[in-house]
Structure formats: C-alpha cells, structure tokens
C-alpha cells in the first residue's frame, strides 16, 4: 500500500473507503486504532542493526487484553494530551487531519510525523510503550477506523462534566 504525502507532511492511505457521514472540526468521534512505534525511538527492545523499532505494535483498541479496548472518543481539534492526566477527548494534529477527510466506516493507514504528533517535547508517562514515555521527535504509524460521529448536543452536554478518563500510572 502506497502512502501519499500531504502538504502538512502527514502520510495517508485509504484501506477501506467509508460510506457514512464525514466529521467536522470540534465533532466528537469514536475511532479504533492500532499504533506502531515510528522513527526516533530507541530502547532495550529494538532492531539493534538499525537502532530503531521495526513494526512493533504497541497499542490497539482491538486488543481484548487492553483494559481500554473498544473505540475511543476524541474531539477533533482538542488539545494534544501531553500531561500526566489524559482528559477524555484529547487528540493529536495528525489524527485530526486524517479524521476530517474520512467518512464513518472508513479505515486509513497513517505515518504521522513528529510535528503532527507529540513534537519536540514528547509526551508524559501516560503515553507509553513498555513503560517509557513517548520520546521527543517520534513519528507514529497507525491505522485508524472511524466508527461513529456522536451527535453534537450529546457531546456538548457530556464533556464539561467528564473529568479525567484515567490517570497515568
């Protein structure tokens, strides 16, 4: 599958074309994801010859053993989560850009460059793989599936009272 590079640097390929509605900025959506560690990462569990992780799946909402399995809820355009407490709905710019071009039922492959992910700072211990924080300058490779767009009134009513979805360990 060939990824096309967008002007922003996001690499994008359609796996399944969706047939449902298309979300807009500030919409709350439910999505599945599978995330692979991208370039810019080193640790004790990597390809020593190339000094990078290669095709290492580190998080998936399809994983039945993951306590947070099932589709996750994000608000397109919400602040990038970088602190110790993830607030329900937070997203990253690369996901937002892709979601705005998708339709419900669609699935895409992405290669999100660092400036559209967690950038120069990286992210807190919440966003981890094998107990390490998401490091600075890390790209993210993922597949995402747009499951549902939540009705506008429903998410506007829910989010102010939602509080933290879960905290870093």
Label every model-predicted segment:
Residues 1-169:
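Cross-family detector of peptidyl-prolyl cis-trans isomerase
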